[in-house]
């Protein structure tokens, strides 16, 4: 009997002994503090590294500790990847808001909390345990944990903060807005003044270009007669909308001031004559006269014409 006991003791001592329990490298991101708005979806990632055995399995558990309270188990993924809910999260309504998935086997695990509420604010802890079979028994070889704090900002607080930011921003740009309005007003006034100056100049030039009637007295010609001419510089009168029928202009009677020669009853037209050699006359015996003919403008109906008919007689001075 004693020999058997000694043999068993030697076998136990000589057989493979389990490794000493160590620590896994566990990291939770984002962290250590993360902020979410009320109603958003939160995602927490649990990274695991430095496993002691290649064939080992991992059991992942998430704990939740509200502000000023002890942590409580929320959800667990067993070594066989079975999801289990605990506490208040075991209810169907809460189960739909909480999801635990394995992104990469034995490396990355994701916890999603949907439609955040103010009661979801607190500390979230991820605890991982490495398990494997030894002598037909499941043995824990190592474990590790990491935590992060989640803060849920209510909509009212978010609106207040955004309103304050907008208020500060508006106060900053308010002065710039006033200055911009003043600059625009000055620009508009300058444009209006420039337009008025141009309009006034155009009207002034139009008035200056109006033509008036002047009676010009010409000096006496060689025959001792005085010729009175009319200069017309008046602009064209505006035409009426309807075209008037053309009427034959009848020359008016010769004014009384113009001298009428007794010997000439009717004006005679000059006929082309043959060239005749005439004696040269000195320049002293010649009298020059210039007559500028201006075609009169069409006068409106009922307005007297400004055309003057004059007969000029030339007499050669005797030496």
From Swiss-Prot:
PROSITE patterns per record: IG_LIKE
UniProt PTM: Proteolytically cleaved to generate a bioactive peptide.
Pfam families in the cross-refs: V-set
Subcellular location, principal: membrane
Stretch forming the signal peptide: 1-23
Glycan attachment residues as annotated in the record: 25, 41, 143
Membrane topology field: Single-pass type I membrane protein
Tissue: Peptide Lv is widely expressed in various tissues and the central nervous system, including the retinal photoreceptor layer, hippocampus, olfactory bulb, and cerebellum.
Subcellular location: Cell membrane
Chain ranges of the Ig-like domain: 24-154
Role, per record: Peptide Lv enhances L-type voltage-gated calcium channel (L-VGCC) currents in retinal photoreceptors.
Protein name: V-set and transmembrane domain-containing protein 4
Organism (species): Mus musculus
Gene name for this UniProt entry: Vstm4
